[in-house]
Amino acid sequence: VSGRLILARHGQTFANVERRLDTALPGAELTDLGVAQAKTLGTKLVERAPSLIVSSYAIRARQTAQHAEDPIGLHADAREGLHEVQVGELENRSDEESHKLFMKVYESWHAGDLRSRVPGGESAVDVLDRFVPVLDALRGDYLEQGSGDIVVVSHGAAIRLVAARLGKVPGGFAIGNHLANTDTVELVPVAGGGWECVRWAKFEAPFHDTARAGSDDPMG
């Protein structure tokens, strides 16, 4: 198995600028900067020559994939299950109290409490149960067939959770190292159905369980 799974966060959205907890489908659109970020992502991915680009059904992820696909010459496809962590009653909230409540629950997931949730929102188990099977299917259909790298355009909180769990990335590192818009995380399939996380944005493995200064973007 030689191909890598490249998990890419979408470009900047109007909700990101407004610091709104925007998780429900279809969600906010990309800003002009977000479009530019998506195009730059595509240019950077050209040298990787991915065989497939897929995204969540959120507008921001689909737009990012569509702008990124042009330099590569692929047609992006949307898949169920790849959307952002759902925040229930906190949807569209931008107040500090809501951000802190979500982050408290999110940090508890990385500490091992996978069943906690904000009111009306998803637990980590809910997210993993819908997200991981999509990645497993892509692995079997593409990566294990020698098709090269594949790109999944998704969302910051979901990517960090899934990549940390699958790639055994320390929780402190995952919490402390948010993903900026169009940052990527790379997973490599290993024997026995597992995954190894080899890159997290600008960092390469090994990853250390130390918290860094966090981001003010709650979904990054």
What label would you give each PLM region?
Residues 15, 29, 71-132, 198-201, ...:
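Phosphate-handling substructures
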Residues 3, 8-72, 122:
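Active-site-proximal alpha-helix that buttresses catalytic centers in soluble enzyme cores
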Residues 55-56, 129, 153-154:
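Short beta-strand scaffold positions
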Residues 67, 161-165:
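Active-site signature of alpha/beta-hydrolase-fold catalytic machinery across serine-
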